[in-house]
């Protein structure tokens, strides 16, 4: 494979990880990074794999899904995790790093690898076939390249993500929530409904208007799509706007009263098993502490809500992965192109690095003319892959970026003692299932990072 050169576009965590995994398997890599020729508004440091803050890699505890992902990446010889461990700073069970030293370490390892050639220029067009390329240009992909990518994906490219909160099923008060689809359509248990009377509704709207918002960065001037407005922006347009929009009660009579409430918050099943529920239409720029406070205090049935994910809206270029990408992360309409990182719809630095590793493994399988072998579904890597393929989501799911969470994993079998017992069962199963997949990796040409 040493005579074959693969181009990796983007020197963030996904691109750096992909380049490393390819190079250590003996593939010649051209890593193209636009810095310092051009910087996005989020770039400050000169090197590769730039993080925005020291604790961006989050929890290192394997009882959390992202901590389990850390563990799996270490077992697979991840450059990102190796350099993170080498530049770690004390932060409890979080994997916090010295950002500058981390970026320098990643840059040094890649620039010092004989199989990696780093080129500094901005790419404005997609590489032509037949040579293989990994596109890992991140959430702030330049306009020219984004336009080419939109053409290649049939227009299924989004420029903002609008993420609504997700609540763990077990934390919803079922004595208040009731199952019903609008006008009784569907199976009847596709949605849970939280009824609000007029006083509760107005108190909730007031809390939304007064809640603290995340300030927009200079490159994130709020130009929202009318069909995907933040819930607080809708509230600003009039007291009853939400009651005629995402909280409209029409066709959702409360079985206890036989009448429509003044307003209804709908929760849609987020996974096939119903372990997590999405607050429909609740994309928001409220700060995360405010979301927890307001939704628990003012939404009936969510007083003890455990949030699997909190809402956000920000600039984020990403494709509709389940429809655009093949299972090996190649573009269906342009199979020589593989996507990796946040542009695929994974959220977070660790998830981006993991996606880069998966894309590299897919490229290696393509070069070896063998079928792609996805990570086992019950692993953290496999859960991310299930998200990208849509397997983790119910039919008709509106694809949005996601961190790795246990709700993306296949359901457990048997009985487990509480939430901690279920997490431990997920971890044990993932550890067991990852081992055979590790053994299928091509032998590295050089030692792994770390």
Curated annotation (Swiss-Prot):
GO cellular component assignments: cytosol
Cofactor(s) demanded: FAD
Residues where FAD binds: 10-15
Enzyme Commission number(s) of this protein: 2.1.1.74
UniProt-recorded Gene Ontology molecular function terms: flavin adenine dinucleotide binding; tRNA (uracil(54)-C5)-methyltransferase activity, 5,10-methylenetetrahydrofolate-dependent
Domain of life: Bacteria
Enzyme class: transferase
Similarity-based family: Belongs to the MnmG family. TrmFO subfamily.
Protein's job: Catalyzes the folate-dependent formation of 5-methyl-uridine at position 54 (M-5-U54) in all tRNAs.
PANTHER family assigned: GLUCOSE INHIBITED DIVISION PROTEIN A, METHYLENETETRAHYDROFOLATE--TRNA-(URACIL-5-)-METHYLTRANSFERASE TRMFO
Cross-referenced HAMAP family: TrmFO
Protein name, per record: Methylenetetrahydrofolate--tRNA-(uracil-5-)-methyltransferase TrmFO
């Amino acid at each position: 494979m040493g005579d074959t050169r693969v181009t990796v576009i983007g020197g963030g965590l996904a691109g750096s990880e992909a380049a490393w995994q390819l190079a250590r398997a003996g593939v010649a890599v051209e890593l193209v990074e636009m810095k310092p020729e051009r910087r996005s508004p989020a770039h400050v440091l000169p090197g590769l794999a730039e993080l925005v803050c020291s604790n961006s890699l989050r929890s290192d505890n394997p009882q959390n899904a992202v901590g389990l992902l850390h563990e799996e990446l270490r077992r697979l010889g991840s450059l990102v995790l190796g350099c993170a461990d080498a530049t770690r700073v004390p932060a409890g069970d979080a994997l916090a790093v010295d950002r500058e030293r981390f970026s320098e370490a990643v840059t040094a390892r890649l620039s010092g690898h004989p199989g990696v050639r780093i080129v500094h220029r901005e790419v404005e067009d997609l590489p032509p076939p037949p040579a293989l390329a990994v596109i890992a240009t991140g959430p702030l992909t330049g306009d020219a390249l984004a336009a080419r990518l939109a053409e290649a994906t049939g227009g299924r490219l989004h420029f903002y993500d609008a993420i609504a909160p997700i609540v763990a099923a077990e934390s919803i008060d079922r004595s208040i929530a009731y199952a019903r689809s609008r006008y009784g359509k569907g199976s009847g248990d596709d949605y849970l409904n939280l009824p609000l009377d007029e006083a509760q509704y107005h108190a909730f709207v007031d809390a939304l208007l007064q809640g603290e918002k995340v300030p927009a960065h200079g490159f994130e001037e709020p130009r929202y799509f009318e069909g995907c407005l933040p819930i607080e922006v809708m509230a600003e347009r009039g007291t009853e706007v939400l009651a005629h929009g995402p909280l409209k009660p029409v066709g959702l009579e409360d079985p206890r009263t036989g009448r429509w409430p003044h307003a209804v918050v709908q929760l849609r099943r987020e996974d096939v098993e119903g372990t997590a529920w999405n607050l429909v239409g609740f994309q928001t720029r409220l700060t995360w502490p405010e979301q927890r406070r307001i939704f628990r205090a003012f939404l009936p049935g969510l007083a003890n809500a455990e949030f699997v994910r909190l809402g956000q809206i920000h600039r984020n270029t990403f494709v509709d992965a389940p429809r655009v990408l093949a299972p090996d992360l190649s573009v269906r309409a342009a199979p020589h192109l593989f996507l990796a990182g946040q542009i695929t719809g994974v959220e977070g630095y660790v998830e981006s690095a993991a996606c880069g590793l998966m894309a590299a493994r897919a490229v290696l399988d393509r070069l070896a003319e063998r079928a792609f072998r996805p990570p086992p579904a019950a692993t953290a890597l496999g859960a991310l892959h299930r998200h990208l393929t849509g397997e983790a989501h119910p039919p008709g799911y509106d694809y949005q970026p996601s961190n790795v969470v246990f709700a993306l994993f296949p359901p457990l079998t048997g009985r487990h003692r509480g939430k901690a017992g279920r997490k431990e069962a997920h971890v044990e199963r993932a550890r067991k299932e990852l081992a055979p997949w590790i053994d299928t990796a091509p032998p590295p040409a050089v030692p792994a990072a770390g």
